[in-house]
A protein has these predicted regions:
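Eukaryotic endomembrane system proteins
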Residues: 363, 371-372, 376-389, 394-452, ...
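Nucleic-acid 5′ end/cap handling module spanning
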Residues: 24-28, 32-37, 111, 123-134, ...
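Phosphate-end processing signature that detects enzymes handling 5′-triphosphorylated RNA
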Residues: 1-283
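Structured beta-strand/turn binding interfaces of compact recognition modules in eukaryotic regulators
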Residues: 37-39, 122, 183-185, 194-196, ...
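Eukaryotic intrinsically disordered and solvent-exposed regulatory patches
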Residues: 16-20, 166-168, 178, 195-201, ...
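Short helix/loop capping segments that flank catalytic or ligand/cofactor-binding pockets
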Residues: 44, 191-193, 201-203, 236-239, ...
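Conserved loop->alpha-helix
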Residues: 339-378
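Intrinsically disordered, low-complexity regulatory tails
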Residues: 131-132, 167-184, 200-281, 376-410, ...
Length: 610
């Protein structure tokens, strides 16, 4: 048993030994919590939060409330007599529950009636030798396990009266929580998924304020917390092993949501896979980031890339030795076969997903393939298909410089082409599943059609479009992808250097029917003069203060598109002349002129569209 697992086991064992005998009293109510993403590898995002909730629902968990539970937690500060500094009473907090009571407090910053709030003190549980049992971080799963004791502080006690009497004169830290609790009849605990707004932090310490308004609480960014809390009333009959197994089962459900796979693995393993990937592509980055995705982006096909021309030009043209395949309605991901044969998918944000598959052919270990991950077919049935369209590395060897497709039957042609290598790899992969011989992921190579002396690229396109129209694909397609036959990955006539980072390939094109065309907007939030975001409410003419509905707030965003004055002209040249905003010839080429600019459609023109 590893050191981390031993620590995890010992805390659960201590809790199981204590809970039947001590439910309350001076030592307090036992509380065993497991929190995710609060320390270490990766913070929890809104997408993570949503994915975990979906995964819990799919495993039979039910929310106790559809709207969630609203909680305002207030922690008072005190002056450290030794240093004179303001410090937070980390183990004592006041809690107000319910949106109506929270609204009331936010208006007045005065505690409600005595029965409508409570004060809690939380302390670390004690080991058998009466020393504190501190929380333990389990880095392998990016979680923290803590066993503590909670006591309610009576409001007429000395400590309670002190907190209440000094309330208005004491600075505080605030946390507003909207918590959705999931429960399952087979598990003795609650899984809490929380959206949190907190007082601002400076160097990981809360900034204290007297009021909610001074703390600017509701304008601060949201954070997301996921935790398992054992229900003491449901643990009867649970041994340490039984409770640990139940917890680990739910840890798996949560990690499956966070990693977007039915086969979650430890973050230690994911880190090792990421390091191996970077070493293979010879990228010197310390960690994975979006620009380490080596699959090149394609350009949108333009008229200049289609029109037949007799002029000598450097503009790539699909009439000149190109191949075409379908563009699937799936997610672009790299398929990476690790040094032990385990197969992972890596998306464009460099998030790694274990597929639950392995290759038993060591000839293809340390291989990188590019393709599209298609989860459902046209009818909505789950197919879990990976459709490959290129290969970059095979068994540690970089094959990106190879030409793509063989167009002739010339026996003298001894070149090795990437499409040939890709097909051989897929056919010889010897794919198996880790839980059985049937692999959960289906892997196929896409079919490419190339232009030749008897068939133009447009005839090749027609073949694919006819197949799509006649249901020749089990999955949805939304266009075509054009790949040059004679060039290595990312290479052009002028650029012959392979790159180990993200790039756009000006010889690779994508085309979509008009009904599938989209515009990618870059958004920024509208700011006030002081730089803070503009936040408005849905109802500005007044609100019903007797209602328990949450006040709906929104931010104003500005839609922006990429604009380059060197290529696209000037946004408003007449106004530039009036304002004497004339670019200097000496520095016009030294400035990065590609920038996000507010979107102004020209047909029809609408100055307020952004």
């Amino acid at each position: 048993m590893s050191e981390e697992k031993q620590k995890f086991h010992s805390i659960i064992k201590k809790y199981v030994n204590d809970v039947p005998y001590v439910s309350s009293g001076e030592k307090g109510v036992p509380e065993l919590e497991i929190r995710f993403g609060t320390y270490g590898n990766k913070r929890t995002t809104r997408i993570d939060y949503d994915n975990v909730c979906k995964n819990l629902l799919s495993h039979g968990f039910k929310p106790t409330s559809k709207l969630g539970k609203s909680i305002l937690r207030v922690t008072n500060s005190y002056i450290d007599r030794n240093t004179g500094q303001t410090r937070m009473s980390s183990n004592i907090r006041t809690e107000i529950t319910g949106i109506d009571l929270i609204k009331q407090y936010c208006k007045t910053n005065i505690l409600p009636e005595s029965k409508d709030y409570f004060i809690q003190q939380k302390k670390h549980a004690s080991k058998d030798d009466n020393t504190s049992l501190f929380p333990e971080n389990i880095d392998a799963y990016n979680l923290r396990i803590a066993y503590s004791r909670e006591n309610t502080i009576y409001k007429d006690s000395k400590m309670g009266l002190s907190i209440i009497d000094s309330w208005n004169d004491t600075k505080k830290a605030f946390r507003y929580i909207n918590r959705t609790t999931f429960v399952h009849p087979d598990f003795p605990f609650n899984i809490d998924c929380s959206i949190v707004k907190s007082s601002k932090k400076t160097k990981n310490n809360f900034t204290f304020a007297y009021t909610v308004q001074e703390a600017n609480l509701f304008n601060n960014p949201e954070t997301y917390e996921i935790e398992i809390e054992v229900d003491n009333s449901k643990t009867e009959g649970y041994t340490t092993e039984k409770l640990e197994n139940a917890i680990m089962k739910c840890v798996k459900y949560i990690l499956a949501g966070l990693q977007q796979t039915n086969y979650p693995v430890s973050y230690t393993e994911l880190k090792d896979v990421g390091s191996s990937y970077l070493a293979l592509i010879k990228n010197t980055s310390d960690y994975l980031k979006p620009n380490t995705f080596i699959g090149p982006n394609s350009f949108t096909l333009q008229k200049q890339n289609i029109v037949v021309t007799t002029k000598t030009t450097n503009i790539p043209n699909i009439n000149d030795d190109y191949s075409v395949t379908d563009k699937a309605d799936g997610l672009r991901k790299l398929l990476y076969i690790h040094k032990d044969g385990s197969i992972y998918l890596i998306n464009t944000n460099m998030n790694i997903e274990f597929t639950g598959c392995k290759s038993e052919n060591n000839k293809y270990f340390n291989t990188i393939i590019d393709g599209e991950h298609i989860s459902h077919d046209k009818t909505g049935k789950f197919i879990n298909l990976y459709a490959c369209f290129d290969v970059y590395f095979i068994n540690n060897k970089d094959v990106r410089a190879n030409e793509f497709i063989k167009k002739t039957q010339d026996p003298e042609d001894k070149k090795i082409y990437r499409l040939q290598l890709l097909n051989n790899t897929i056919n010889e992969l010897m794919l198996v599943g880790i839980t059985g011989k049937t692999p959960p992921l289906k892997i196929m190579a896409k079919r490419f059609y190339a232009s030749n002396d008897s068939s133009s690229i447009f005839m090749a396109c027609s073949q694919i479009l006819d197949l799509a129209y006649n249901d020749g694909f089990e999955y949805e397609t939304d266009g075509l992808i054009f790949t040059p036959c004679k060039y290595g990955v990312g290479l052009t006539k002028q650029n012959t250097q392979l790159r180990s980072s993200k790039t756009s390939w000006e010889y690779s094109f994508k085309w979509k029917p008009s009904k599938y065309n989209t515009i990618d907007f870059y958004i920024t939030t509208k700011k006030q003069e002081n730089g803070e975001e503009v936040i408005k409410t849905v109802f500005e003419t007044g609100t019903n203060t007797t209602s328990s509905d949450n006040i709906l707030q929104y931010k104003v965003i500005i839609l922006r598109v990429g604009f380059d004055e060197k290529k696209d002209g000037y946004i408003n040249p007449c106004l530039d002349v009036i304002n004497d905003n004339i670019p200097k010839i000496s520095n016009i080429d030294d400035v990065d002129s590609y920038k996000p600019t507010p979107f102004y459609p020209t047909n029809p023109y609408d100055p307020n569209a952004n």
